[in-house]
Regions:
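Hydrophobic helical h-region of N-terminal Sec-dependent signal peptides
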Residues: 9-18
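N-terminal secretory/targeting leader peptides
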Residues: 10, 25-115, 123-337
Length: 337
């Protein structure tokens, strides 16, 4: 755990201990869309276990994964209405509520996994998502979803290889613009429709994390995965503002500490899990894994420069500049997961 998180949550934990007698018996519900083998499914489990431990059994959490409570759009509506207490979600799906959150969609933003982990544990990272509270969604902490890569029936080694292909993206303007800038036909589509659409030829390709490519079986209908890492996707544990406001100080402290613990677990496990899946793909010989050289990856960054020109001011040039300054001491490292 970083020094920042240690300092903050040590004080919160102390507050919880001092006010332990005021912790009430509470039953919460968390939803997410992850499959059991995905790291963020484990994050939900870790959060539930730590919440129960810290509250000495008074606060319990039922985790409903694999879209049992609905898709992410439905989940966010439930969070805003206070029908569901917690959700685990990618920042890319929160851009509709805050322009600043869209900064994480800018292509090739983070220099390395190390830089990403350090930034996610910084005060600035929490400042970026603070405006979500005005929309009824409170962010509790970050962990990585992983690098997003191109999976396709075309061997993609340079931006020109993407030209003309029909690629599914999340319905977020910047994510669509990334592939439009390379000449692809970017098609926004609900995640649950991707496999069938690939199978039926409605789309030629998608862009997802290795965990999603593996867990959803996309590799069975696409021949290639190109490790371009155009986005390093942050995930958030969020709580309904309605639920948050119903908690007393001791309960809030326990929720924050449990979330910090679960997010740190996610930070430690996501990239390793993705690397293990890549090794499994390589050993099986399917799909073919295409690893880009630094020179090849730089061509993708150059090809998407227009996305920055179009969107950096709308997401907040000051926020972007702060992220880049934060990374100055970190070396560039190509994604291996």
């Amino acid at each position: 755990m970083t020094k920042f998180y240690r300092a903050v949550f040590a004080s919160l934990a102390l507050a919880a201990v001092l006010a332990a007698s005021s912790v009430n018996a509470r039953e919460f519900v968390m939803g997410h869309t992850g499959q059991p083998q995905m790291t963020f499914s484990g994050v939900g489990t870790q959060f539930a276990e730590k919440l129960k431990e810290l509250s000495k059994g008074d606060m319990t959490l039922s985790v409903m994964g694999a879209s049992a409570l609905g898709n992410n759009r439905e989940g966010l509506e439930q969070i805003q209405q206070g029908m569901t207490d917690f959700w685990i979600i990618s920042t890319g799906l929160l851009a509709q509520f805050s322009n600043a959150v869209s900064v994480f969609d800018l292509p090739y933003l983070f220099k390395s996994e190390e830089a990403f982990i350090a930034f996610m544990s910084s005060p600035l990272a929490m400042e970026i998502v603070a405006p979500l509270e005005q929309k009824g969604i409170k962010a509790l902490g970050y962990f990585p979803y992983g690098w997003r890569h191109i999976h396709s029936n075309v061997a993609v080694r340079k931006p020109e290889d993407v030209k003309g292909i029909k690629i599914r993206t999340e319905p977020a303007p910047i994510r669509m613009a990334i592939f439009k800038s390379m000449g692809a036909n970017a098609i926004p589509m609900d995640f649950g429709e991707v496999f069938t659409s690939l199978q039926q030829g409605v789309i030629d390709a998608g862009e997802n994390t290795i965990e999603s490519i593996e867990s959803q079986g996309f590799y069975t209908v696409n021949k290639y995965v190109t490790l371009d890492g155009h986005i390093l996707d942050p995930m958030l544990i969020v709580i309904s503002k309605i639920t948050w406001d119903s908690l007393n100080d001791a309960e809030k402290a326990i929720v924050q500490e449990a979330a910090a613990y679960a997010c740190e677990w996610g930070q430690k496990n996501t990239f390793g899990n993705c690397k293990a899946m890549i090794k499994k793909f390589k050993d099986a010989g399917k799909p073919e894994i295409i690893e880009l050289t630094p020179e090849e990856r730089s061509k993708f960054r150059e090809a998407t420069k227009a996305v920055y020109d179009e969107y950096v001011n709308s997401v907040g040039k000051d926020v972007y500049d702060k992220i880049m300054k934060f990374q100055e001491s970190f070396a560039e490292a190509a994604p291996q997961s």
